[in-house]
Design a protein with these regions (language model features):
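Conserved class I S-adenosyl-L-methionine
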Residues: 212-222
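Conserved alpha-helix/loop element of class I SAM-dependent methyltransferases that forms part
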Residues: 176, 190-212
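Structured loop/turn residues at beta-strand edges in well-structured enzyme cores
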Residues: 211, 262, 280
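Generic N-terminal amphipathic/basic segments
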Residues: 1-92
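Class I SAM-dependent methyltransferase SAM/SAH-binding core
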Residues: 217, 227-273
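Solvent-exposed beta-strand/loop surfaces, strongest in extracytoplasmic domains of secreted
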Residues: 181, 185-191
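A short acidic, Gly/Pro-enriched loop at the edge of an enzyme's catalytic core
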Residues: 272-285
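N-terminal auxiliary segments of SAM/dcSAM-dependent transferases
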Residues: 79-169
Length: 286
């Protein structure tokens, strides 16, 4: 029987100020398995990102108010556009420090996530295929042309962005996104990274208590972090997620099924063209 640890004296403790331990992250049947060292990498990044957001970024605002904005007012008058603000901040040391560190943690976060997912890629892909094979709630379009604004850059520094595939039927990019977002946000979105969707659902229920949507359309749904809370909050509605990235959609349906959420559909499409949906056929678009 393990020995009970003695409780520290109150004078020796202080309230925790930081993200929760990665071991508390919400896990489901599609979630990648993590080793001790992989967990601690995510813990370091979560704490670093929380520190940058809570301690370093406010210093950028202070520098803007104390140096950048007064210099602009003396030189040309008020800033006219956000682009002008950004250009001025690029020369500010406080912004340079924050920006360099934030970029570094994002690159490290992608390295950490890919170490986790690529080593078990075959197992993840097989698990997703087993859960989604023959399910008409996954509607992929191999002939869809991915818009250039998605192919021109690796969004969030993720190699291949959200649409890239290492092998046919790949879900490793989506799994990387799912297991690493907790570290990116410092746990701010909750155990399942679904805080945004839960907040929207709660607000709608409070503000529109009689609203009973039959169909909800989520554009740019990714793997469904914000889609599933809507499906759970409105169980009689069909919640349809649209995204350009096939890996995200494969993983999204597999994740939904692993979590026991059935009233969902994942559709690969360019959100610029929604002609497949008839006019007035949905009650809620987001």
């Amino acid at each position: 029987m393990p020995q009970e640890r003695s409780k520290p004296l109150k004078s020796e403790t202080s309230a925790a100020d930081g993200p929760p331990d990665y071991r508390l992250v919400g896990r489901h049947g599609m979630f990648p398995r993590t080793s001790h060292d992989e967990i601690e990498r995510f813990n370091f990044l979560a704490h670093m990102n929380r520190h940058l957001a809570s301690q370093v970024l406010p210093g950028v605002q202070a520098a803007f108010e104390a140096r950048v904005e007064p210099a602009q007012l003396r030189r040309e008058g008020p800033f006219r556009t956000r682009h002008a603000v950004r250009k001025a901040l690029l020369a500010e040391p406080a912004f340079q420090v924050w920006s360099a560190l934030r970029r570094a943690t994002m690159e490290q976060r992608q390295q950490a996530g890919r170490w986790v997912t690529l080593r078990q890629g075959e197992a993840l892909n097989a698990r997703a295929d087993e859960l989604t094979d023959g399910d008409d709630r996954l509607q992929l379009d191999p002939g869809m042309r991915t818009p250039r604004y998605l192919t021109a850059v690796d969004h969030h520094c993720m190699p291949g962005s959200y649409h890239g595939e290492v092998i046919p039927g790949d879900v490793t990019g989506a799994a990387n996104y799912d297991c690493g977002l907790f570290a990116t946000t410092g746990g701010a979105l909750g155990r399942f990274n679904d805080g945004g969707g839960r907040a929207v659902a709660a607000w709608v229920k409070e503000q529109l208590p009689d609203f009973k949507p039959r169909r909800i359309l989520d554009l740019g749904c990714g793997l469904g972090h914000n889609l599933l809370p809507l499906a759970l909050a409105f169980p009689t509605a069909e919640v349809i997620g649209v995204d350009a990235g096939a890996p995200m959609l494969r993983y999204g349906l597999a994740r939904a099924k692993a979590m026991g959420v059935d009233n969902v559909r994942f559709v690969q499409a360019d959100a610029e063209d929604l002609s497949r949906f008839a006019d007035e056929s949905v009650d809620w678009v987001q």
